[in-house]
């Protein structure tokens, strides 16, 4: 895996010495998040924040759940946007408007229609093709009661077939039969839903083992971090609970577990 720092130019002022330039660069690097970019054949995937992902192939860009809390100055304009759910850190109208190319489809689940009136609704089980990209909508829902609750049929995961690869962005879900039945996955983005106890590590291991993707990225695993922060407050230290447990259980099954830096420190 390679890490890429996309940093802008200093807009004004002259730095007099090499030492000062070095100090200034260090400050800028502390402010700009590292963007982790992996290549799978001709497909390039960049991870941003929580559940925000960029997929590129042959000059086409897919944005999944873009969120303004990420540094979107390093995101590319999208030919296709996929939204998994209607919650603000999945469906961010401002981020969609910023990254959407003119005429680019925005795929939403039915619950996103009020916020994206011109969105393309995909129901669980639907398949659509956008140029050379095929998208299958997979059910994503909760079984255990409690809030927030995701009823069956209101949110999607997506299997994205592009560049000869099958990439499964699972969305917010428990280990339901629809998820467990997906096969032939090259790359999976699989949620933990902590601390809500709806997708604990043991359930995730069971589901991923059945799916048997070649590579899996745990994502969407810190619900405390994404909660709104009061004025003057600070976000909590990101959790890492369950990540090493997944790695220890899945690596012997020839499933590569990659840990991305989803939450800025």
What are these regions (language model features)?
Residues 93-100, 157, 179-180, 204-208, ...:
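Short amphipathic alpha-helical segments and helix-helix/interface helices
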Residues 120-129, 205, 209-265:
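Binuclear metal-ion centers of metallo-dependent hydrolases, dominated by the metallo-beta-lactamase
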Residues 36-76, 119-183, 259-265:
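Core dinuclear metal-dependent hydrolase active-site scaffold
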Residues 69-72, 87-91, 113-116, 126-129, ...:
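Active-site environment of divalent metal-dependent phosphoester hydrolases
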Residues 1-29, 33:
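Intrinsic disorder/low-complexity segments
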Residues 63, 68-114, 183-189, 212-213:
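Active-site metal-binding motif and surrounding structural segment of the metallo-beta-lactamase
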Residues 56, 100, 251:
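Anion (oxyanion) recognition and catalysis
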Residues 159-228:
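Metallo-beta-lactamase
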């Amino acid at each position: 895996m390679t890490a890429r720092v996309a940093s802008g130019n200093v807009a004004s002022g002259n730095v007099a010495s090499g030492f000062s330039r070095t100090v200034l660069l260090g400050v800028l690097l502390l402010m700009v998040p590292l963007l982790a970019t992996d290549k799978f054949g001709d497909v390039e995937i960049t991870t941003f924040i929580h559940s925000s992902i960029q997929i590129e192939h042959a000059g086409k860009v897919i944005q999944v759940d873009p969120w303004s809390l990420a540094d979107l100055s390093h995101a590319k304009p999208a030919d296709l946007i996929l939204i998994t759910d209607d919650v603000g850190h999945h469906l961010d109208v401002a981020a969609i408007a910023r990254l959407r190319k003119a005429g680019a489809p925005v795929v939403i689940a039915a619950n996103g229609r009020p916020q994206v009136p011109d969105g393309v609704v995909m129901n669980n089980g639907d398949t659509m093709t956008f140029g050379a990209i095929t998208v299958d909508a997979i059910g994503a829902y909760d079984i255990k009661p409690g809030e927030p609750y995701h009823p069956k049929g209101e949110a999607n995961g997506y299997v994205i077939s592009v560049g000869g690869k099958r990439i499964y962005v699972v969305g917010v879900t428990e280990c339901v039969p629809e998820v467990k039945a997906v096969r032939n996955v090259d790359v999976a983005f699989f949620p933990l839903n902590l601390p809500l106890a709806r997708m604990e590590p043991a359930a995730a291991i069971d589901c991923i083992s059945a799916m048997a993707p070649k590579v899996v990225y745990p994502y969407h695993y810190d619900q405390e971090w994404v909660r709104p922060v009061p004025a003057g407050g600070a976000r909590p230290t990101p959790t890492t609970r369950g990540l090493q447990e997944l790695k220890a259980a899945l690596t012997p099954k020839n499933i590569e577990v990659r840990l991305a830096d989803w939450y800025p420190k």
